[in-house]
Amino acid sequence: MTITRKSHPLMKMVNHAFIDLPAPSNISSWWNFGSLLGLCLMIQIASGLFLAMHYTSDTLTAFSSVAHICRDVNYGWLIRYIHANGASLFFVCLYLHIGRGIYYGSYMYKETWNIGIILLFLTMATGFMGYVLPWGQMSFWGATVITNLLSAIPYVGTNLVEWIWGGFSVDKATLTRFFAFHFILPFIIAAMAMVHLLFLHETGSNNPLGIPSDSDKIPFHPYYTTKDLLGVFILLALFLTFVLFFPDLLGDPDNYSPANPLNTPPHIKPEWYFLFAYAILRSIPNKLGGVIALVLSILVLALFPLLHTANQRSMMFRPISQILFWTLVSDLMILTWIGGQPVEPPFIIIGQIASILYFSIILVLMPMAGFIENKLMKW
């Protein structure tokens, strides 16, 4: 008689994905972030659902409905701050997950990598629309500025912006549709994450050495379920500490003022996790050029499999590539800092240099480093 988990149609799928899945014996804690992202998504969907029960997507009542959640709903303040800071946690895990993929050459699984890029775009869209919903000053002006960028598209730009707005400015129609999209997108993300996992399990996981691990596999359960669980507890401990002690640290004070179309905030900026892309956008004086650079800053990830010149998959034994990788990480931190600064010297030139360096490292220096390392290996 076969074990139920191996024969039952539903349990069989779970079994193949999380229990009897053959996994490399040497994957490090950097491989924990996939499961942590799944946890983040579940936290966001659950907290978001409870917020949606009390939120109203109307320009007159949106701001006060968020205040009502925080003041009058049982543990509403906690749900609200879990959801707001959960977005930051999501992006921290997301960027670490992508960084791991770049460092260890996981992008060579092209289907998994490309679906990951689509997931990144979907998550960024969800995060942006969620930021608009509280209808504070930064919500309103952030929505106005970012959606208005589409007007840079030749010929159809203006019509496209008015179509997205549902009028001639960001108003009730915009807020209502943003709420609708913000509600549905996480479920699309969840479905895409399953496809992401499906393609990953076609090839099996990569490992820190970047070499085939078919000869040395271990079952996912109990080894990696336990390991992932440790990551979950550490993550939740850090997250709850942040939510309960520093809930407003990453928010913008301007968002505690209701949206006012007649009063522009001195510095319009998105949430911290978009600042690197915002800095790249601002570093180009031309509007259309900035929009193209903004999209390319994320889309450039799709070129990683094509630009891989090294004979070794992982960067573990490639010191030149390692230096470039950590330079890229530092460069992204500089871009994040610049994105939050006003457009004035010396921030303008720093942003422009950092933007050029970002694309140079990925498109030119990393492929060159791989080529040089191949030559050095032959000595």
Curated annotation (Swiss-Prot):
Entry's cofactor comment: Binds 2 heme b groups non-covalently.
Binding site for a ubiquinone: H201
Binding site for heme b b562: H83, H182
Binding-site positions, heme b b566: H97, H196
Family: Belongs to the cytochrome b family.
Residues that span the membrane, as ranges: 33-53, 77-98, 113-133, 178-198, 226-246, 288-308, 320-340, 347-367
Keywords, comma-separated and alphabetical: Electron transport, Heme, Iron, Membrane, Metal-binding, Mitochondrion, Mitochondrion inner membrane, Respiratory chain, Transmembrane, Transmembrane helix, Transport, Ubiquinone
Gene: MT-CYB
Known function: Component of the ubiquinol-cytochrome c reductase complex (complex III or cytochrome b-c1 complex) that is part of the mitochondrial respiratory chain. The b-c1 complex mediates electron transfer from ubiquinol to cytochrome c. Contributes to the generation of a proton gradient across the mitochondrial membrane that is then used for ATP synthesis.
Cofactor requirement: heme b
Record-level Gene Ontology MF annotations: metal ion binding; ubiquinol-cytochrome-c reductase activity
Location, primary (coarse class): mitochondrion
Membrane topology, as annotated: Multi-pass membrane protein
Quaternary structure annotation from Swiss-Prot or TrEMBL: The cytochrome bc1 complex contains 11 subunits: 3 respiratory subunits (MT-CYB, CYC1 and UQCRFS1), 2 core proteins (UQCRC1 and UQCRC2) and 6 low-molecular weight proteins (UQCRH/QCR6, UQCRB/QCR7, UQCRQ/QCR8, UQCR10/QCR9, UQCR11/QCR10 and a cleavage product of UQCRFS1). This cytochrome bc1 complex then forms a dimer.
Any one Gene Ontology BP term: mitochondrial electron transport, ubiquinol to cytochrome c
Provenance organism: Chaetodipus rudinoris (Baja pocket mouse)
Localization, UniProt: Mitochondrion inner membrane
Pfam families in UniProt: Cytochrom_B_C, Cytochrome_B
GO cellular component, one term: mitochondrial inner membrane
UniProt protein name: Cytochrome b
Misc remark: Heme 1 (or BL or b562) is low-potential and absorbs at about 562 nm, and heme 2 (or BH or b566) is high-potential and absorbs at about 566 nm.
